[in-house]
Amino acid sequence: MAMASLAISVLAFIVSAATLWLSHLYRGKLQMTRPTVVFFGPDGGASGNPKIYLRTLIYATARRGIVLENLYVRLRRGETQQNFNIWVYGERDLARGSGLFIGQEGIATNHHFLTPNDVNGFDFAAGEYKLDVFGKIVGRNRVSLLSSIDLKIDAQEAEKLRQPDHGIYFDWGPDAARYQTKIEARRASPMDQLKLLETLRDGATDPTAQPIS
């Protein structure tokens, strides 16, 4: 009887310790689902700055959640690579990325990434691409690689992308288990660029903004 009581007490202690660790001590990881859609092309408006857009669910494996400090993408093609480090996110209301709390349930939203101001353009030429998504977590020195996505643009698609206002969509096809491409001309309204610039300048939500994907 005494041994049974001791075993129950030890088991209860282990369960309590595990619960404490999972709830308060375990820092967990930041993860993301495979993006359902990825876009390469102009951001809309007169300047036509290169942009990468994707939609995904970002979530934390820890119960206490994680604070995401920054998110950016790196696009590689052969020996060429370019960081798209200006991060804007949201559905109808766009906000400049400047910290976001991510819980276990995650946040599914649109993410827009633009090149730095000192980059005049980026040629989405034909070739095989690798799109890496990185997240910087508050309190951790290293950035985390959240996803690495393989994409391809053929010669015919690259030629179309050189036309003004044209972009390429990569839509995930679950049956084919690969991304399917679609070229579209994007006729953005003159206000789109202004709204995006206001969001980048103020670092706050623009309540009148519309999706720029």
Feature locations, PLM:
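Acidic, serine/threonine- and proline-rich intrinsically disordered appendage/tail regions
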Residues: D150-S213
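Extended, solvent-exposed segments with strong compositional bias
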Residues: F84-A126, F134, V138-N141
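Membrane-embedded hydrophobic alpha-helical segments
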Residues: M1-R27
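Beta-strand elements of well-folded, non-transmembrane domains
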Residues: I58-A62, L75-E79, G135-G139, A155-E157
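Extended low-complexity, serine/threonine- and proline-enriched intrinsically disordered segments
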Residues: E69-I86, D132-G135
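Low-complexity, acidic Ser/Thr/Pro/Gly-rich terminal tails and inter-domain linkers that flank the onset
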Residues: L22-G48
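Contiguous beta-strand segments within globular domains
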Residues: P42-T61, I66-Y72, G103-T115, A177-L194
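Terminal connector regions
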Residues: P116-D171
